[in-house]
Amino acid sequence: MKPQRSLRFTGLAVLSAIASIAMGFSTLALAGVALDLSPQQPDRIRVQKDPAAVKAVSAQFRFVKDDTLTIGIHPTIPPISTYATDAKTVVGFDADLAQVVADSLGRKLELVPVAWADWPLALESGKVDAVLSNVTVTEERKLKFDFSSYRQDQVGFYVKSDSKIVSLKEPKDVAGLRIVTDSGTNQEKILLAWDKENVAHGLKPVAVQYYDDVAVRNLALQAGRADAVFSVNATQAYQAAQQGKTRLVGTVSGGWPRTAELAIATRKGSGLADALTTSLNDLIASGTYTRVLDRWNLGSEAIARSATNPPGLPKL
């Protein structure tokens, strides 16, 4: 059985190898679709109060602040959530969804930035009413928190816009390709599992590549040193819209072979989850949910219906 090949590159090594294209790549963000990262967010979508959602809030639930929905959020990278050009206002899909959910409950929105590792404590301590920050539903997390699902957890294969590759959606499609992925992630586990299956069936192994810098990774793809990048779909969709130099050729559930969903987290048994689920389903029915997704180029990750405490990924 031929062993899998894998390569790890540091930023300096790759930059020196492909410096000839760096100057051109630095202006790519101006060539594609510019998403709004201003603090003003003039095109942010707003909605009216949803009586059904308001009624679904348990009488026992106490909000952190009167007339306000306080949401914990971890600003990372666009389009999910990031800081605006003023370096202090949180913008992105999660912020927009939090806004329309707050609107539907007839409340003002307050976003509280939290470190990723601290979101459970922020909820348990009562610092926030809910957390909306790309949290995947797992059976282990459901022991402590309630969830209202709002988006598919997807990872995606992206290639150069002029690549001859049309589709990468199943194990045999990646055989023999040079694919960049992220070490220690679900997407790496998926890619390695697919590669193992391919080798067992006599197909060519994947040449797995790892980079310690996203910009360098993108440069490697544009230079033809890799055939595809397999990473978080949302962030790659944003880059594709901004730069116009890559395109999607396949998505896979982040929990493959199971389906994984992202959800708003609330304290277990607090009485807020059903109201959030009602709000989300009414936003889906009205088309507002789709508009919010499309504003951040995330339409491919839509769900048909929100659920309270949907099946989560099993504890490993």
For each predicted feature, which ranges?
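Extracytoplasmic small-molecule ligand-binding "clamshell" domains
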Residues: A34-N134, R295
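Ligand-binding clefts/hinges and TM-proximal coupling segments of bilobed small-molecule sensing domains
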Residues: D36-A53, N186-L203, L248-V249, N281-L316
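Beta->alpha turn/N-cap motifs
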Residues: G72-I77, V112-A117, G126, A130-T138, ...
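Short helices/loops that flank or line small-molecule/ion binding pockets
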Residues: V100-S104, V112-P113, A117-A130, K144-F145, ...
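A ligand-binding cleft/hinge motif common to bilobed small-molecule-binding domains
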Residues: A117-L121, V135-K142, I190-V199, Q222-R258, ...
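Periplasmic-binding protein-like
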Residues: Q152-V159, A241-N281, L298-L316
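Flexible hinge/capping segments at coil-to-helix
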Residues: S161-I179
